[in-house]
Amino acid sequence: MKKQRIVVKIGSSSLADSHEGISKEQLSDHVAALARLKEEGHEVLLITSGAVAAGFSALGYPSRPVTIKGKQAAAAVGQSLLMQAYTEEFRKYGIVTAQLLLTRSDFSRKEQYSNAYATLGELLNRSALPIINENDSISLEELTFGDNDMLSALVSGLVSADMLMIFTDVNGLYDKNPQKNEDAKKYYFLPEVTEEIASLAGDAGSKLGTGGMKSKVDAAKTALSLGVSVFIGTGRGQEKFVDVLKGKGDGTYVGNAPQKEMKINKQWIALHSVVSGQIEIDAGAATAIIQHGKSLLPAGVTNVSGFFQVGEVVEVMTQQGRVIGKGQCTYSAEELRDVKGMQSQQIQARGERHNYEVIHRDYWVSF
């Protein structure tokens, strides 16, 4: 089996004991299976939930708190306890762990996004196992990543993973709720996430988790768009993750055919960047960009909206108002208003620029 880069996401429901806390037995089971992946020569990143579950009892809560401040307080206590438990277990296998706590803003700010990419790459090069969680104790919005399902998809794209394994307490995707319908049909393989499949996933998670199957399906769709195949399911024992790679996992495989990965800068533009303005273009420019993969030139620009600076991301729309994509603009809004509609030779004659693309094709994402 060739060496692969694997992202494994373990949700709260796959870590919890009967009292809603963290089960040492389950955690040990997961660690043993992750160590087997490493033993087989694979690079492994772990996305783990469970900070709230690990910390609420230490603060005297009788059960998992329901308020945002209660969850964040429990996460602040539980994250260190959770990391300590993982570190002690991985040490038995001689594996060095590293902790990364991320929020949405770490993805939306390009410098932080690039730093996360560089740090993860270096950790993997040094054979460490990164353990990643949302920074629940300071996140501004409740349940930002949906029990880390979307976080796992975004990280898998960031590191160009070969596979994302989302482990939960349900053994895959069904056409209806298997707990309520005996005739529920299980999907063993889905080539893609269609609107029909997305609509079948329920909204509610388990009592212990926050994601539910809908967030897992959404995460799978995002991962596929980034060139990463996905497995959603469950399992026990030391071989469970290796079995997934062998096609023997207890769950649903989604899009396991080779996918074209999206470059890091385009991932940031497509999924994380904040749009600072809009550019309207003519039909010829739209055809050149979408059908022929060309860069956007000033000659094709017909209107500029907003007040953006050089390097900020803008949406691009047709004269009929249809948004066709977005990209990083090499002009400020003021500069672009001054040169819109001009041919490159005209701009060159003014002696103001040596870079004539408004948006270079390497910094463009089509919708």
UniProtKB/Swiss-Prot annotation:
It comes from the Bacteria. PANTHER family: GLUTAMATE 5-KINASE (PTHR43654), ISOPENTENYL PHOSPHATE KINASE (PTHR43654:SF1). InterPro entries: AceGlu_kinase-like_sf (IPR036393), Asp/Glu/Uridylate_kinase (IPR001048), G5K_ProB (IPR041739), Glu/AcGlu_kinase (IPR001057), Glu_5kinase (IPR011529), Glu_5kinase/COase_Synthase (IPR005715), Glutamate_5-kinase_CS (IPR019797), PUA (IPR002478). Keywords: Amino-acid biosynthesis, ATP-binding, Cytoplasm, Kinase, Nucleotide-binding, Proline biosynthesis, Transferase. Its main location: cytoplasm. This is Glutamate 5-kinase. The keyword Transferase applies. The keyword ATP-binding applies. ATP binds at residues 9, 168-169, 210-216.
